[in-house]
Amino acid sequence: MISIGTDLVHISAFAEQLAQPGSSFMEVFSAGERRKANERQGSRYAEHLAGRWAAKESFIKAWSQAIYGQPPVIAEEAVVWRDIEVRADAWGRVAIELAPELAAVVRESIGEFSSSLSISHDGDYAVATCVLTIQ
């Protein structure tokens, strides 16, 4: 079985959310994701993180779609977003890496799976699609 999730992020609105005084939104990103974002300058910083946020959301949507007709395994407010990490290889190709505890919960709900991820940016938008292949 294949399950797909997609998310679209308006980069300007996302950047405003990041810049709000007292915002804890950066906590949804892992230390590695924040480190990579800090390598970007100006608007590229928010663009980079918007793509990562879209990727995390697309994973949750693909997982949710895989259990269609069943209640959610984790309430939305209980998701530890930094446990869904977007990593890039040496050539910039991205993948989702789950924290071990979250990976175990996902496997318990859908069985063994693999994921594929794509992130794209165009103008003021970032989009991500995650495909879960469930064995």
Swiss-Prot record:
<keyword id="KW-0275">Fatty acid biosynthesis</keyword>
<dbReference type="GO" id="GO:0005737">
    <property type="term" value="C:cytoplasm"/>
</dbReference>
<dbReference type="InterPro" id="IPR037143">
    <property type="entry name" value="4-PPantetheinyl_Trfase_dom_sf"/>
</dbReference>
<dbReference type="GO" id="GO:0000287">
    <property type="term" value="F:magnesium ion binding"/>
</dbReference>
<keyword id="KW-0444">Lipid biosynthesis</keyword>
<dbReference type="Pfam" id="PF01648">
    <property type="entry name" value="ACPS"/>
</dbReference>
<keyword id="KW-0276">Fatty acid metabolism</keyword>
<keyword id="KW-0443">Lipid metabolism</keyword>
<dbReference type="GO" id="GO:0006633">
    <property type="term" value="P:fatty acid biosynthetic process"/>
</dbReference>
<protein>
    <recommendedName>
        <fullName>Holo-[acyl-carrier-protein] synthase</fullName>
        <ecNumber>2.7.8.7</ecNumber>
    </recommendedName>
</protein>
<dbReference type="InterPro" id="IPR002582">
    <property type="entry name" value="ACPS"/>
</dbReference>
<keyword id="KW-0963">Cytoplasm</keyword>
<comment type="similarity">
    <text>Belongs to the P-Pant transferase superfamily. AcpS family.</text>
</comment>
<dbReference type="InterPro" id="IPR008278">
    <property type="entry name" value="4-PPantetheinyl_Trfase_dom"/>
</dbReference>
<comment type="function">
    <text>Transfers the 4'-phosphopantetheine moiety from coenzyme A to a Ser of acyl-carrier-protein.</text>
</comment>
<keyword id="KW-0479">Metal-binding</keyword>
<dbReference type="InterPro" id="IPR004568">
    <property type="entry name" value="Ppantetheine-prot_Trfase_dom"/>
</dbReference>
<feature type="binding site">
    <location>
        <position position="7"/>
    </location>
    <ligand>
        <name>Mg(2+)</name>
    </ligand>
</feature>
<feature type="binding site">
    <location>
        <position position="57"/>
    </location>
    <ligand>
        <name>Mg(2+)</name>
    </ligand>
</feature>
<keyword id="KW-0808">Transferase</keyword>
<dbReference type="GO" id="GO:0008897">
    <property type="term" value="F:holo-[acyl-carrier-protein] synthase activity"/>
</dbReference>
<keyword id="KW-0460">Magnesium</keyword>
